[in-house]
């Protein structure tokens, strides 16, 4: 019978963060991953936030496959097919080492991270799906069952890092099943372009990179956002919407993405690119209010499986790595103190999370999902209005500026009452303050 | 008994995906697998191991990532795995590959004498089917290609009987040991590794042999230098812009008639040639070839 201190289910950033930290501290760790190798099934934009990884592997920059460091962020509000109103922030300090954010390619990143996990001493077994949790008479989780023959494996604690679907925990009744209202579906393509072309089109050089976040009506009124990131010699472009909205509309995510790629603002940026890869993945975007119970007797949930995603800032992998690390550190401390992995002792994990940016950020934006679901015009109307207003002001046609401003205000009031506008402003401020 | 199985890591052509909207082929992210034909070879070797307690050693010549493919074989039940890897081996065609493998197998044979060597019928990325025969010739072993089944194996008498698919039928061949067998697809089905197998594969050391380990001194015979073949060009057949036509008719006979009419209309010379050919046949067989209805 195989028995470990800890079994980690899943080899994404959350599972790798946990397994690495545990193995480094000398615990015996088994990590199980259903993909052919770590990363084959995982999708991300992908922006890597250095801080979260640095706290796990301080010298990661020496070996980690990084694409570009980000020096500029653009925020674009776009309609379906004509306008784009944008803002950008470029900062020379973003080009001073150590860099804070990078673009990465997840397949390579996950492979690298997994190699570090193995080097740290964890046993990593791929192509093996965990089907259920094993429990003893008193309900404590004591291991996992895999789909392989003779597939029961035991451990003092199981960390569930199985990603957005969170099937293992749901099936075991540890957490409610995830609903379409709390889930976004995102599609993404990697488009190849020579490095010089990427550099020229985005006004960058060396390993500098640009990130573009896109909101507005490119999602055809559905709640969601798009993105365009620069890799070394490719671009990552994607769009995602709430699953419940997609179900209602007949548009497929691929059609949305094709629409985005045809938009006159995007098209010249990706012109002539060769598509290398496309993928689709779920993102749990229910936020703070949708968080499940995070620990119990002999188990903990980390990363996407717990719903640790900050949809407003498109942060997920950093919350995943951080929660994985914190779960691991909880176990390491308990083991050192000779204490069992009981629910009461594992509550320390939740307390650490509460004191960290993970919970603070999720709490801060807890009203955003509801706001945008209940007030869909926030996404559709305002971007269009902004576009119209900009066009009005920038078209020189002999009409006085004052008359133009009056027309713009009249347009806006025609779309929404003054009280409605005030209400929106208040709700917006509430949700993001 | 000691059995060696030569495998190769190849891109999984079944998982090369086509984009749903633009229909372009997605080359990235295609996982590497053990060449499917090699798995039939390995399973056959493992069945012999199950029956006789033989030792099974898998080996591959390839770049370092090919270790994954070897671990996969360990998970199924192979006892040892050897990765033969060296920069000088890259760019090898089948001649150079069989040279390296044969040298490594000779070294392996000195450690524990070999009775059987298996390879797959061919690889899915090269399709040449030349490496197995190349090994047999170089080692002077019996060669049994396109084997679908092993009927009998008598290690004591150093003899085996196999079924070999040949044009027009199945040959049953008896051979002496040691022999090289290239396995056909479909004769067996690879087992699903159990959990202890997965653990063993994750924990066991894969031996790494460079040119010295494989006992290779003559570097003119390996890698690009040892490879007389070069791929001059790769191209896909051009699709023809011809539309399918529909032939209608109430009965099969009517349809056949309409088809023949159409054929003769489209290819006028065909009718004349066919008639001339029939006349010629009739002349040769002096009436015997005449249709039955007419002779009656
Ligand atoms: C299009 C898109 C863009 C994104 N962009 C960003 C970004 O720019 N920056 C950012 O920080 N985040 C981004 N995210 C979010 C980020 O990808 C996730 O938050 C992060 O991957 C979560 O990590 P994880 O380890 O929890 O889950 P995952 O990365 O999903 O890993 C889970 C792993 O568990 C395995 N697994 C699942 N079930 C089982 C089972 N039963 N048995 C064994 N193994 C199992 C899976 O195969 C997988 O490897 C993006 C997400 C998407 C979809």
Predicted feature residues:
Chain B
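N-terminal glycine-rich FAD/FM-binding segment characteristic of electron-transfer flavoproteins
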Residues: 1-296
């Amino acid at each position: 019978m195989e028995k470990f201190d800890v079994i980690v289910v899943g080899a994404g950033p959350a599972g790798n963060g946990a397994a690495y930290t545990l193995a480094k501290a000398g615990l015996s760790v088994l990590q199980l991953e259903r993909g052919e190798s770590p990363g084959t099934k995982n999708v991300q934009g992908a922006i890597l936030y250095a801080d979260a990884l640095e706290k796990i592997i301080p010298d990661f920059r020496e070996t980690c496959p990084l694409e570009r460091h980000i020096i500029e962020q653009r925020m674009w509000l776009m309609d379906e097919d004509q306008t784009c109103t944008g803002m950008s922030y470029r900062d020379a300090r973003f080009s001073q080492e150590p860099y804070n954010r990078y673009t990465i390619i997840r397949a390579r990143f996950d492979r690298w991270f997994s190699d570090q996990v193995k080097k740290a001493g964890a046993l990593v077994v791929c192509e093996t799906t965990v089907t259920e949790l094993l429990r003893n008479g008193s309900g404590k989780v004591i291991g996992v069952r895999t789909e392989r023959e003779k597939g029961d494996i035991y451990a003092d604690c199981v960390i569930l890092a199985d990603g957005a679907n969170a099937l293992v925990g749901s099936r075991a009744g540890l957490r409610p099943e995830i609903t379409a209202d709390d889930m976004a579906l995102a599609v993404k393509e990697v488009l190849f372009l020579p490095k010089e072309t990427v550099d020229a089109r985005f006004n960058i050089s060396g390993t500098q990179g640009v990130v573009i976040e896109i909101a507005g009506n490119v999602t055809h009124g559905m709640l969601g956002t798009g993105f365009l990131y620069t890799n070394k010699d490719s671009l990552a472009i994607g769009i995602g919407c709430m699953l419940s909205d997609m179900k209602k509309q007949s548009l497929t995510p691929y059609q949305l993405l094709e629409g985005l790629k045809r938009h006159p603002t995007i098209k010249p940026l990706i012109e002539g690119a060769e598509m290398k890869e496309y993928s689709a993945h779920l993102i749990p975007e229910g936020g703070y209010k949708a968080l499940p119970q995070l620990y119990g007797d002999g188990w903990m949930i980390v990363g996407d499986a717990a719903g640790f995603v900050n949809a407003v800032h498109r942060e997920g992998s950093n919350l995943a790595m951080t929660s994985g690390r914190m779960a691991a550190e909880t176990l390491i401390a308990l083991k050192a103190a000779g204490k069992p992995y009981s629910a009461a002792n594992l509550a320390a994990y939740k307390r650490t999370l509460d004191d960290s940016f993970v919970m603070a950020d999720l709490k801060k934006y807890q009203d955003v999902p509801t706001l945008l679901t209940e007030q869909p015009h926030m996404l559709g109307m305002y971007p269009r209005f902004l576009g119209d207003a900009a066009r009005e002001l920038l078209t020189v046609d002999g009409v006085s500026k004052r008359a133009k401003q009056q027309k713009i205000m009249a347009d806006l009031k025609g779309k929404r009452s003054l009280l409605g506008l005030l209400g929106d402003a208040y709700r917006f401020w509430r949700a993001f303050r | 008994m000691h059995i060696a199985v030569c495998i190769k890591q190849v891109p999984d052509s079944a998982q090369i995906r086509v984009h749903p909207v633009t229909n372009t082929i997605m080359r990235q992210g295609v996982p590497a697998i053990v060449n499917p034909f090699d798995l039939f070879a390995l399973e056959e070797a493992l069945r012999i191991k199950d029956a006789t307690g033989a030792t099974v050693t898998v080996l591959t010549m390839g770049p370092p990532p090919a270790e994954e493919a070897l671990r996969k074989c360990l998970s199924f039940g192979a006892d040892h795995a050897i990765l033969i890897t060296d920069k000088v081996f890259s760019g090898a065609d089948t001649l150079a590959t069989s040279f390296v493998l044969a040298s490594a197998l000779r070294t392996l044979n000195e450690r524990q004498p070999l009775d059987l060597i298996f390879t797959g019928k061919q690889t899915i990325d090269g399709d040449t089917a030349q490496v197995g025969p190349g090994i047999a010739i170089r080692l002077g072993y019996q060669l049994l290609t396109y084997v679908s089944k092993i009927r009998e194996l008598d290690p004591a008498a150093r003899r085996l009987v196999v079924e070999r698919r040949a044009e027009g039928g199945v040959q049953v061949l008896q051979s002496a040991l040691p022999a090289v067998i290239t396995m056909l697809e479909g004769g067996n089905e690879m087992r699903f590794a159990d959990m202890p197998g997965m653990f063993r594969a994750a924990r066991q050391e894969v031996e790494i042999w460079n040119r010295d380990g494989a006992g290779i001194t003559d570097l003119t015979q390996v890698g690009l230098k040892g490879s007389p073949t070069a791929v001059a060009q790769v191209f896909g057949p051009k699709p023809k812009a011809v539309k399918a036509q529909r032939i209608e008719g109430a009965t099969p006979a009517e349809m056949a008639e309409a088809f023949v009419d159409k054929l003769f209309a489209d290819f006028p010379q065909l009718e004349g040639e066919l008639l001339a050919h029939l006349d010629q046949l009739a002349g040769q067989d002096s009436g015997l070839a005449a249709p039955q209805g007419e002779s009656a």
